[in-house]
Structures are given as C-alpha cells and as structure tokens.
Amino acid sequence: WTWNGGGVRPGGGAAPDAVKIGDRYLIAYSATGGGLGGGHSGKVLTMWNKTLDPNSPDFKYTEPIEVASSVNDEDCDAIDAGLLLDPTDGRLWLSYGTYFGFIRLVELDPATGKRMEGNKEIDIAIDCEATDLIYRDGWYYLLGTHGTCCDGPNSTYNIVVGRSRKVTGPYVDNMGRKMLEGGGKMVIAAGNRQTGPGHFGLFKVADGVETVSYTH
C-alpha cells in the first residue's frame, strides 16, 4: 500500500465529502460528534476550493460555513456528511447522521454552500451511518453503513441500500422495508481477508466512467 495524503482542511474535522459545482469544489465535513467517546454534540461545515490539488497555487479554502449541528441530548449526530448535486434539477442535498440516531437530509444552496433559508431537516433512515446519495434512471439510492466499526476483526460494518422516487424518501429496500424503520439491502459485506467495509463513496472519473470506494 502507498499512502497518498491530500490537502489539510483548516480546523481539522473528519469524514469529508466533495462535489464539483461549476469550476469550484464544495467540501462538507464534520467537527466532533460521532456518539460513544465522541459525544453527540457536533457540526457539519462546508467550504469551497478551486482545486483539490494541494500543490496548486489556487489551493485555498474559504471560511467554513455551519450547515447542520447537534447537541448531546439530540437524536441525531451531525457527522458523516454526504453530498448530492441532483442532475435532474441542480438542487444540492446533504445527508448526515450516525448509527446512534436518525439520518437526516437538508437542502443547501449550490451557489453559496449555505443551508437554504427556512429549510427543515428530514429524517430518512435509522440504524446506519456514513450515508451517500446517488441518482440513477429516475431513482434516488441511499447507501449507508450498518453495524459497528473500529474493533479490528470483530467489526461488523457492512453497506446497505434503499431507493426512492423522491430524494426526500421514503427509501425502501428490495423486501419493501423502509430504511426509516431499519430496512436496507446489504450490498457490500466482509470477505475472508477484509473486515468491516463502510463509508461508501462514488467518484466520477470521466463521462460514463465511475469508481466506488469504501474502507475496511
């Protein structure tokens, strides 16, 4: 294995996602939170950059913008951001949350990266975390990581999916179970040599060419 590090975001943070909008990249990431030792208090922040290449002279982040937050007694952790720029209408959506509460969806302004004024979060799933949204042929797919992580060979992470005709849900698996009620079809599980696959990501290499990523 070869480690290829990227640019460091100001203020640290974890679990980033990025989407290209026009000639800029919008990055969403988490500050604190995560349940258990991390507590439930957290924030999801967004910032812009002209490039993701830390060696470029144009590499410079804008000031972070808070788009979601949670407090210690809340039923959702503001962590694990996932971005979707809807190809059907250009609207921008952010999912976030962990296994310790609801997965929530909010709408952002694609011009500013700020939360749309007056937008109220929507609960779309439970019993998963590190969600990502994909649009395909009239369907919105919600992928989430189910199970426990960070326990070596005892980790039970796996990736589940549901789909909906609307980005706001309801997301349903192949058996008709709603992800808001704990449903989700397993699509990636542990193998003989790998334990705990999670944090699904999709990367567009070129027109018609995409690759997926996940961690063990």
Where are these regions (language model features)?
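Blade-loop segments of beta-propeller domains
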Residues: W1-I21
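Beta-propeller and closely related beta-sheet repeat lectin domains
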Residues: G12-D17, I79-G82, E129-D132, G198-G201
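Entry beta-strands of beta-propeller and related beta-repeat scaffolds
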Residues: R24-I27, G90-W93, W139-Y141, V209-T211
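Asp-box/WD-like beta-propeller blade repeats and closely related beta-sheet repeat scaffolds
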Residues: G34, G38-L85
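Short loop/turn segments immediately following beta-strands, especially the blade-tip
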Residues: N49-P57, E107-K114, G162-V172
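Loop/turn-rich, solvent-exposed surfaces of beta-rich toroidal or solenoidal domains
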Residues: D132-G176
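Conserved blade-ending motifs and adjacent loop-strand segments that build the rim/top face
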Residues: R177-H199
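Conserved small/polar residues in nucleotide/adenosyl-binding loops
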Residues: T215-H216
